[in-house]
């Protein structure tokens, strides 16, 4: 008894000194002082609950603050009445256990003790995981901060799945977790599902701490979401801890990125290096090796690249264009680069089989050409760390997979201006089939371009797939004479259902279309590999995701006019295009207005690129709404 108290007091002194050395408060926090200047909401009697002891962080009042260190260990000398009572409670706990619950107030996902401070101290000394408590929840008075919104999401989660242990630091994570488990935040979860999540989380947390996760700036629940995005959760309970630890080590950089602020997660590479722009084009011998720097490839030792397409190239124009880019590499680099393609890999098993085959064939680089393949690509990249993986997407913060996409908003800005110059009634249609990263910047750039030519222009926004031949019907229904569809036809059977069109006498006629030059894009990326500048793009000491985001100035994006377009119109659009390429025109510079008000005032510089990628608003001349994201696909294990 005496020895236990002396050890506990020693821990208390250590905790107190450590807090002082780190300029932190060395005693227990009291809730009364914490909320004295804060607006508070209602109280709710939650009832009798088992709560995690690690979340018990202070007292309700100041009364016993100085008797405990900030780690809840005792500070008063042995021989005091306090020490005697603490020791008696210790004896009861180790011989028969406590019968009565403590009384606590919950505030912002932390607990403050009203009755039972010494019992909490004893249990923490014994490393007990939980304590029985009568809980009263105190709600904040406002919900306008990130912390309060996160707590609101936790409360919604807790009502359907009463687990205190699950704590996230990113908004939206509770909903993501619910979707992964086939649940939602509205209907109460079956008890079996609650128990399953509790056991799964505790198993994962144990492995996470064994791997050194307590040194990261994320919670164990944050880390579990990252893990489940890569590895299947169905067998997690049956997976030995050492295997989970090994997997965590493989995705460690993904965990590090998860702990960064959004603005620090991604490096946007917006232009190729000078070497990539001006590199020698083609060689079939070792002459080019002189120029290769760190990375040496030749016809005898080629750079092998695999392309994995979501659908067959014969039926998908998107995949067909990417495959044309692949073929361009074979021709352009004359044997120094050799490629192979895998089509119709939207099924995860087919995708992973394609990766395995490509690796067996000696692939150094693997491109997956759809953003919907990113999760499969991430899983494969973790399994094959020596292979470089890239996915055609933007704004996704994965260190193991580089992303690449084009500044399509630049082309849409030009198409918007062109549309306004030809619309009869100030109404212009915009049909978007997919809500993905970058989609809103394209819509807004189109709307801003239209407003430059016609301040009264309205952009009528619709979403979803359009059946073959359905564009004209959609235009009539919306009362518009000019409309832009998808960047390209989803099916080669309907080649007119994309780009900017005009409805004349019931017939759809093309005006212009955006153009992807994937051959040029792949050439620039491959040059970075051939010249050894790939690794110079990112700093190994700063773990960040790398996203290539090239535009018109790099030659990867352009527009193509339909025959017969008036030369005056072409001249106007060409002037705007030159401004985009030279950098003197940016659709997101200066005064900007959204449907909800002013985004920025006149004279402001263009929005930062990260804000353009992550745009979450619609321009004030857009008539439409932002849809809710569909459920993300689950990624089966390899």
Question: Where in the sequence are the language-model features?
Answer:
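Flexible loop/hinge segments that line or gate small-molecule binding clefts
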Residues: 382-405
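An alpha-beta-alpha
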Residues: 326, 414-457, 540-563
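Segments of small-molecule ligand-sensing domains
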Residues: 531-537, 541-638
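Short, charged/polar connector segments at secondary-structure boundaries
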Residues: 1-118, 124-125, 170-183, 190, ...
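Periplasmic-binding protein-like
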Residues: 362-371, 390-392, 480-489, 508-516, ...
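Extracytoplasmic "Venus flytrap"
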Residues: 305-324, 329, 342-348, 436-440
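Hydrophobic alpha-helical segments within soluble ligand-binding/sensing domains
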Residues: 404-426, 515-536
